[in-house]
Amino acid sequence: MTQPSCPCGSGDPLDDCCGRYHQGHPAPTAEALMRSRYSAYALGLVDYLRDTTLPAQQAGLDLDGIRAWSHGSTWLGLEVENHEVLGGQPEHARVTFVARWHDADGEHAHRECSGFVQRNGRWYFLDPTVALKLGRNDPCPCGAGGKLKKCCGPWIT
């Protein structure tokens, strides 16, 4: 039996692509995590979307809204425009992409440059829509030990 293709657009079977990350294997790059998150939206894997967001931001996610958007949309495709590893301790990266979907209001395209941070061997999405009540000189919520302004601050403040 033929496995379904991965929604991320790689052309690979789901189990050989994003499916392995959905099952708990860490994504090796920020781009792989971003692709797996797009696939999670297409497949309705809201817990995965929560778990791959920076832990300090997870409580602020609107999981019901994410679930409604995920299930109420037909996911049409993903185009990765750029993946840039920024380095640093912890390592940061950004991925620029266009996601396309169709819902009750028609077809949509969303272009975004997303930030990611790697902690303890796992990449996390830095969600700019989830506010953190932190000052620029407070410790960064990624747990690296540095100040927010020098670490993840440019992505989440």
Swiss-Prot record:
Q: Name one Pfam family in it.
A: SEC-C
Superkingdom: Bacteria
Alphabetical list of InterPro entries matching this protein: NTF2-like_dom_sf, SEC_C_motif, UPF0225, YchJ-like_M
Entry's family note:
Belongs to the UPF0225 family.
Q: What is this protein called?
A: UPF0225 protein PA1039
